[in-house]
Amino acid sequence: MNDTPENRRPLKSRDAGWARAWAAALARRGVSPDAVSAASVAFAIWGLAAFLCAARFEGISRVVALLGAALAIQLRLVCNLLDGMVAVEHGRGSPTGPVWNELPDRVADVLLLVGAGYGAAISGVGWASAAGWIAAVLAVLTAYVRELGRGLGQPADFVGPGAKPHRMAVLTLLAVVSAIAEPRWLAPGRGLAWGLILIAVLAGLTAVRRTLRLAARLTPPSAE
């Protein structure tokens, strides 16, 4: 990963002491940012497995699985934070860094959103699998529009309301709420299913918004 500052997602957590310490520790141990990016996919697979296990479990086992999914989502985001810090702040970026920065992110998005959808569907909300796929496609579309802009010589546009941090925050919250509220106050899978609809709507709005902003940047100002 060798992005210039204007092409990096603005994150306040990048200045957090723990993030700086972890990035420095990884750099000292010779861990490449590409390996950190790849690790995010491993955590996404963990999250997918946790959602599917939760669909088969009841009681405390389901609670543990859902909380495990929430933890996996957050660890995926930690990897997304640290890969860039190791690459940029510690000068360990590689020529293939941009590839590792983007592709694992898209794979992780699909694994987590589709996993949540199938988990909710197996729990009894049949249409949730389709909601998961729709959310995943729209999530990838938001990144496509951003990278399209960069390919056209424009700065990366990370505007929301359904950018990656927003999507993962909603999905994490849904997993935690489901763990707490099911089955007494919420039918199993129902919260995840409707949450995926929300994520799809937010991602769709984001794709449209980024497209309009890109078109505006590419359109020359009219002559007075």
Please identify what each model-predicted range represents.
Residues 73, 84-130:
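Basic, amphipathic juxtamembrane/active-site segments
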Residues 1-70, 111-224:
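Hydrophobic alpha-helical transmembrane segments
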